[in-house]
Amino acid sequence: MKTLSSLLLVLAVNVLLIQASPDPDNRCPARKYWNERKQACVCKRENRCYPIGAIFDPESCTFSMCQSKGCSAKQIFNKDKCACECRNDQPKDGCGAGRYWCNQDCSCKCSTPMSAGGCSGSQIWCEKSCACVCPNADKCTAPQVWNKDTCCCGCPVNMQEPADGCTKPLIWDKVDCRCECPLKKDCGKNRDWSDSSCSCECKGDGKCQGSKIWCKNNCRCICPTAEPAGGCSAPLKWDDDKCSCACPAKMEEKKEKCVESGKIWNPNTCECGCAQLNCPDNKKANKETCQCECKEVKKCNGGQVFCKDSCSCVCPGGDKDKTCTAPQVYDGVACSCSCPVNMQKPADGCPRPQKWDKEECRCECPVKHDCKNGKVWDETICQCICPRDAPVCTAGKERCGESCECKCINREPKEGCAKPLVWNENTCKCVCPADKQMSPGGCGSGKSFNKLTCQCECDQSASKCGLKRWNADTCKCECQPGMPPEGCGKQTWISDKCKCECSPTITCQAPQILDLNTCECKCPVNMLAQKEKCKSPRQWTDSKCLCECSTTPATCEGKQTWCGEACQCICPGGDKNCGNKKFFDKPSCECKCKNNPTCTSPQVWDADDCECKCPKDKQKPQGGCDGGQKWNDRVCSCGCPVPRPDCTNGQIYNINTCACGCGIDKPSCPKQQIYNWKTCDCECPNGMKEPVGGCGAKTWLDDECQCDCVPGKPKGGCTGAQKWCDKTCKCKCEKEMPTGGCENNKKWCDETCDCVCPQKNTCIAPKVWDAKTCSCICVNPPKCNSPQVLKDTCCCGCQNVKSCKAPQKFIENICDCACPNKKQCKAPLVWSDEFCDCVCPNSASMKTCLSPKEWNKVTCTCDCNPPKPDCCPGTQKWMDDKCKCGCPNAQTDCAGGKKFNDFTCSCGCPSGKLDCTGNTKWSAETCTCGCGDVNRNCGNLKNFNDNLCQCECKNKQEMANCKSPRTWNYDTCKCVCKNADDSDDCVKPQIWLDDQCKCGCPASAQMTCPANKRFIEKSCSCECKSPMPSPIPQGKKWNEDKCVVECANVKTCEGPQRWCDNQCKCICPQVNTKCSDKQKFIESKCECGCETQTQCKDGFRWSNLECGCLCDDKKCPGKQVFDKNTCQCKCPNQKPGDTCGNGKDFCPLDCSCKCKNPKPANGCTGVQEWNEEKCQCECPKDKPKKQCPGGQDWNNHQCQCGCPTPAPTCSNNQKYSNVSCSCGCNPGKPKNGCPGNQIWCDNTCRCVCPKNMEKPADNCKTKWWNDEMCQCVCKPGCPEGGCKGVMKWNANTCSCECPADKAKPASCGDKKSWNDDSCSCQCKSKMPCGGCPPNQQWNEKDCECKCSATGNCPAGQTWNSQTCQCSCPATGKCTGAQVWCSKACKCVCPAQKKCDSPKTWDENSCSCQCPKNMRPPTGGCNAGRTWDDATCSEKCAATPKCDSPKVFDPTTCGCKCGNKPNKLDAGRTWDEQKCKMTCDLPAIPCCHYEGQVYDSNTCKCGCPKEETCKQGFSFSPKSGCKCILECNKKDPGCGAKKIWCQETCKCECASEPPRMGCGPNRYWDKEDCACQCLKTKVCTDSDFSFFSHDTCDCECSNAKDFILNCNQKLNKVSCQPQCIQRPPPEGCAEKFGEFFSWDPKACECKCIEQKTTVKGRVFDKATCNFKCTNEPKTNPKCANTAESWDSQICACKVCSTCKH
């Protein structure tokens, strides 16, 4: 039931999914269905079966017996007409004027082709517009516009080159359509380019500061005196501001530091001077610090540090710090105690759980325990284990780790064995007691002894009894009750079913069935009803239960069929009335002609009308015969009447029109000429004939029907300023020479059409040539102020330059000598024009100051330098004569070892009073600590210590080196072992080692063990690290030397097999033994192959993968198809005896019938084409016979309609139309249509205005009538488009008006008035003539001068509206150490100090601070780190001691590998714990090639060693790592994926098999050199199913089309998404609530929001249920404690079952 309900549920979900999703079949028409993989409608399978010879049409999914033919790409085959038709329909409105529809190309074509001379100029022929057009797009960059005649861009009419050319030196630019400079230069930083003069002009105003003068040539201020010729002496550099040699500006800071440090600054060398230093050989003098420093600062290794005194690397500490305990030795590089080289820690570390003992320099167990219960201690694993030589436990038992005894693996159950079983310790099972055991065969037949129940039981079970009952005594199935006493009657007793039934031997033939009551065969009840309806001539048959004819059905003739109702042969439609000419033939059931005569060709017999008629392809045209031709029924064609007329005037007789004509349909005349059908020649139209008086200066061109200049305008145009005159066909000047001749000695030039200078002189820069005055002039010369004058350099300068005496300089502004930088001097200093500086007034009589005082140029007095401090240190006083602080009573000698103290100015101990150690005391007289009266006799081994006032051992070095496990004996002054009493406990071969204070092996027994062994201290010998396993696998043995289990017998392998040490046998290397279904694995070849190979038939090939012959698809010629059964090409649906019919033969290559009589050699007549189907000439399909328009007739040879000849004569204003075959307007409607809004009128043959746009009765009033536009317009001469200012033209009012966004306001205010030209309010008063005051600008809005800048002043400053500037107050408030600076108008530090990097100066605190990005973190430093304020960074709180090769890492404050390389080798990774490189992939157990082994260093397989081979042999790693014969063969060409291996002398795969094999269900194919699937599948479950060679399974091609959520997965059978979790069996509503429903997209039960409303309730989506709208939000919800809230009635009610 569960299975049925789940199936019904799935069916219901699928129905919902089908209903929810749109029906894909609705997208497709009948006979088709939607294919998801192809994303298109395809034919259904039931519509794909068709009869032999039929043609299937995939568009309509139908079949036709018509043989399709090859149509062009634009055509499609019509099976109804059995012919090609256009895919696109002919345009409804036709192809347009001058174009016709072409059925062969399925497109519109031009009626008149391109003229013989082609298109003019750069134009090309356009098939769409049937006219000559430009090939390139009309995209021109402004201001150029497009020219349709020349097909190129050019300047517009209003932007043409001036008639007299551009004013020099400007030239015309054809791209920008304007006059520009011929070449624009880069003027540099001091000049700007001028587009008016085409030259560079100076930027500045010509004013210079200081002693510099302005130079017009260089456009900059320069020094009056130049830099010395040889330059300044190094390191001095020329100072362009001071105009003299001086130290570079960057050395000013260096100079200040030099002066502050007390050194001497040399202005000539720009360096600080030091006193002479005498440095050793390994040191050099530092001029900056004036000290001796090491010449080379070495980078020390390990723990060494660099000593600046000795200039070498040394270990820190004294000799005591360099003493190590055995066996450690002191490392002079690492500066620490470490193990010797032969006792280093293993590279792979100690075997676990052993740990490395740094002091003992060996691997030891961390703790050693005493073993109990028969266990022994294992030094390798550091545990107590059971003895390894203990015997193996019997089956079902294992050795217990606690007692080392064999105990049962399965313990006795806690509740004991099930009764009557008891526990047996030997067998470890619950067994029957001995008194209840039964011997074999003791239970009798049919029974056996059950060891679980300890009793005899039946062998067979009661499950086989079915309807019978089981008898446990007899162990048999018995019927109960048995057969009835009265018997079964006609039925038989069935003992297996224990009931009476009909005998199974009785069988009834269909359709009869067995009657269970009578056990007889009878017809079914539903078929007996037909027996009553059975009437004559049919009879009822009981055996068949049918009403049928008594006689068997006769074989009917022809199309007659047997009728079961009448029991005779009849025609399907009965007899027909065939008329007079036909009779009814019963065998064929058809009407046939009474007479069947033979028709004369080309007539054929018409079986329908029973008479001879013309064939369908030779029927009389619907519109009759063309021209004057008439129809002939006997020959079935149109022809001209006889006799034919004689033609004149060069005309010939036309058999198509049966009249005389020119003999051509489409004449080709020059562009302007027309064809004269009377004279059969081309001629110019009447309005374009050659003038009677000739063309004058021009020549008549007959092809163009016009007069033109020959030769025409020159290709390059007219020279100079001349222009082409079309009337005279010559170039000439528009401007004539002046009547009075040229001025300023100029001459007239016909080329330029202007007066020019006779010669142009070369001007010296910066002067330029002036073409007006024909002389050199300055461009924009400056106005020079007195006493300066204008020079030839076009600059203002002095006439005479004086030579001034230093330090005065020549000032060019005043043209005289003066001081360049005169300034105001502070008292008592005064200004001196002689020195150009502030000097003392008595500088001439300056006094000579006594040393150490110096002359002060500021105070003009002798002062101390440095000056007197505020206070002297200690008790010192200021000595003005010496200019320093000192003691006036200074002494040189003091009594009792005392020294004079300059700070206190008195005698005293040099070090002051010291804290004495030990028993010593301080003496103020001797200034030392002493012992006083103490016994100083200490013996030979000891000395007296004056510091401690006691005796101590002499050998202090030995005492300092005495470390654990030794101790120092102060009485004997010796280092002795703490455990010296343990020397008697040593067991041989160990002895007491006094240097190590323990029992150990003697030196003679010490040895270095191999890598696979370790040294055992107890036995003083080497033993294997890994113990011998027990038991040893079969076929292997233990090697004590190598400490490994190895193969007992190593064999030599044959073929591709190689020896594997793991399995001790020859195996195939890295080969998957799982082969495909039809292949078997061949051990000798190590590959999958076939057991036997047979010879394949022609066309078939042998497949090693399928182990059989396969047929490959081939491309057959022509229309032949490939037959996989015979593997041959043959024609489809061809049967023996097939014929093509009359007039055709079968062609096996094309599989089609071809005409016996080929196409005529000269082709078909006229425009007719050959029809391969009918084997005759006929009109092409694009020119089928049609109903001709107007009076035209059909021409069968030309396959087109034409007018009858001769044509009628038209009136003067009309002409004959070849389309309507009638007279019409001459000339007709203009080609470009009527101008403006006019329309064409056929009655008057001219363009007229429409009725709704006729001229008004008032004659447009003030406007003029435009006949072309059919509307009233403004009178000409009005300024349309030429309004002043921003005003625009209004076509309605015919006047200039202001735009809507600039309408005139009601008022402009007091200061402004309205201006019509600008359409805006303008100021009444203008800006003052002299301009606005400084810093002010004219404000157009307020009509007055205002400050140009805003009044936002910096903090502390105020705004002055008169001067438009910010001003600073005299005083201000500052915080901290800052003071107020009125010049800078801010608080500043009184002094600034240079900070040591990385600290910077902080203006707020006036001190050096760490930068903001280098401050201590807010949360404090990380664990193990502290803040260093000197470096503004974190540092490690402690430096750990790292074991080599690890080193200290300051970033993590821990240890890291110091030997880690920057780049790892390929295929390797870094082990941070072991500090070495390891392989990134697991080791290869068995290498691919024989003899190779896996190398953990290279992570690859390779030969253990390489041999040197003799001549003629070479070493081969791929052939057993041995010498083999050299290969003499050459590369035969191995093909794709393979290369020639000279080493193995054969083709091998270019790529090796994957390192770890191909993986499951895949194997390595040596032929394809790739991993292949073991089995392939045919994936046809879905249209999207395909077999993937990557996964070796069926996959879906539409997997990317679905975006699956977490609850969905893709079903690979249907290739459709399905839910991972199925809907609950009981349904969503039953499980979660009545409003829950299954969502197939989300694959979960979702709440369905209810839109229906319930009175007093609202739907709550959170609970997915209706809740009461009046439910209280308080708790408790009911005020009365005796009541509770009832959500069913939405009210409080008394609760009868609640306890309150």
Curated annotation (Swiss-Prot):
Protein location: Secreted
UniProt-listed Pfam families: CXCXC (PF03128)
Record keywords, A-Z: Repeat, Secreted, Signal
InterPro entries the UniProt entry points to: CXCXC_repeat
This protein's record includes keyword RNA-binding: no
Cellular compartments per GO CC: extracellular region
UniProt keyword Oxidoreductase present: no
Signal peptide: 1-20
Organs and tissues of expression: Salivary gland.
Function description: Used by the larvae to construct a supramolecular structure, the larval tube. Balbiani ring protein 3 could play a role as a transport protein that binds to other proteins intracellularly and in the gland lumen in order to prevent these from forming water-insoluble fibers too early.
Domain notes: Has 82 approximate repeats of Cys-x-Cys-x-cys.
Protein name: Balbiani ring protein 3
Gene expressing this chain: BR3
